[in-house]
Amino acid sequence: VLAFNPDLLVVCFGLNDSNAEMEGLDTYKEALRNIFQPAKQEKIETIFMTPNMMNTDSSKVSPGDILEPLAELFAKRQKEGLFDAYMDAARAVCQEENVTLCDCYAIWKRMYECGVDTTNLLSNGLNHPVRKMHELFAWQLVHTILNN
């Protein structure tokens, strides 16, 4: 990406990285630094956008579906705080590296805490948001750009 000399770099990842459990947290943080530091050296404005939550229950996936074991695993990781740990780590790295944060994950968490069935907002019942929720990411990114 840096070879294209962008004015702005938007980074968003962590959903799949959390599959490495807590043992992968340091690797995840290092991967973030390996993106942020070269961008900073090139004076490229960088925004880290936290991703959406994973599913919190497996009921949206039909029993016997090939995705059922994943749905159960992801729900466990989400509810037990594993993904929260990854997002907390990302926020800390952003602060350390002075990278602007667009915290969409915090919005998803707040919706969940207010009683929204966030699993219903995932198109595959696992980890990919429905089209309408992509709009949330877009608007939050615009808000972040205009206010930083």
Task: For every predicted segment, state its role.
Residues 1-148:
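Alpha-helical cap/lid subdomain in secreted, periplasmic
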